């Protein structure tokens, strides 16, 4: 009797020897979202190569124990995110990585669950370096009192929390998101998902942060807030660039 199809699941450890680090996201999901997550994570983890055909509906239905409409909705979700394509007389096929929507929040989260490596972190840092300094410069020019209050709140949360705590990382994330919001550019804000994944991955890989490193991190983030408060675009861009490079250095992904 044929064994049922069983994709690589995000809850499992990354395969040995891959150099990947799995970071659980702990997100609640509906049935169709859970199936999409499991299949999406399996694709990202390399369980299905580009050009490979997915198992038939019968195998997938037996594996996930969901209705056919739920399965179809899950596949549609993955098609919309660029991971799959449907071909007449062929079936459902995995697309090349270049076609994946890497700005999609689910696709980014599935990368964390599948297991990330240093190259992935460098890729994230490169897009951050292309966007965040510009966002910080715009924030220095356009910030409102409410924007400044949000920046200061994020920094205060970091200062109040131990460096290996969720509060520290959430404060860090809140500060960076506040920079994007303060830029006044909706496209800058939309990249928040990339920033969130980068920060969560960096924090997981580098935690616990040593006390001396904690002070360095706090001081660097304080310079971002101070530059935006002073309406100094060049200083704000330089400060956030320093923070991104420091993060790369901490987890060993610097070029």
Model-based region annotation:
Residues 2-17, 27, 155, 159-160, ...:
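C-terminal all-alpha effector/ligand-binding and dimerization domain
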Residues 4-9, 99-178, 216-239:
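All-alpha effector-binding/dimerization core of bacterial HTH-type transcriptional repressors
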Residues 25, 32, 144, 165, ...:
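Flexible, glycine- and charge-enriched loops at secondary-structure boundaries
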Residues 146, 186-187:
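Cytosolic histidine kinase catalytic core of two-component systems
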Residues 34, 38, 130, 150-153, ...:
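Generic alpha-helical secondary structure signal
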Residues 1-130, 137, 255:
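Short linear motifs at protein or domain termini
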């Amino acid at each position: 009797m044929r064994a049922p199809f069983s994709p690589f699941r995000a809850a499992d450890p990354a395969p040995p020897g891959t150099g990947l680090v799995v970071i659980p996201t702990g997100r609640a999901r509906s049935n169709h979202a859970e199936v999409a997550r499991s299949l999406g994570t399996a694709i990202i983890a390399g369980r299905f190569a580009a050009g490979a055909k997915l198992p038939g509906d019968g195998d997938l239905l037996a594996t996930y124990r969901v209705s056919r409409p739920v399965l179809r909705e899950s596949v549609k979700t993955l098609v919309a995110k660029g991971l799959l394509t449907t071909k007449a007389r062929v079936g459902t096929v995995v697309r090349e990585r270049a076609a994946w929507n890497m700005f999609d929040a689910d696709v980014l989260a599935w990368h964390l669950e599948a297991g990330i490596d240093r190259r992935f972190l460098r890729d994230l840092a490169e897009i951050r370096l292309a966007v965040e300094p510009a966002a910080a410069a715009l924030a220095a020019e356009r910030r409102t009192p409410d924007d400044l209050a949000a920046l200061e709140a994020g920094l205060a949360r970091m200062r109040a929390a131990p460096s290996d705590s969720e509060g520290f990382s959430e404060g860090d994330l809140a500060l960076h998101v506040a920079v994007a919001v303060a830029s006044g550019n909706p496209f800058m804000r939309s990249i928040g998902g990339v920033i969130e994944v980068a920060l969560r991955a960096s924090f997981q890989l580098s935690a616990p942060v040593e006390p001396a490193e904690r002070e360095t991190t706090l001081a660097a983030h304080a310079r971002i807030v101070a530059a935006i408060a002073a309406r100094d675009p060049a200083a704000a861009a330089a400060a956030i660039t320093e923070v991104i490079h420091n993060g790369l250095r901490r987890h060993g992904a610097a070029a």
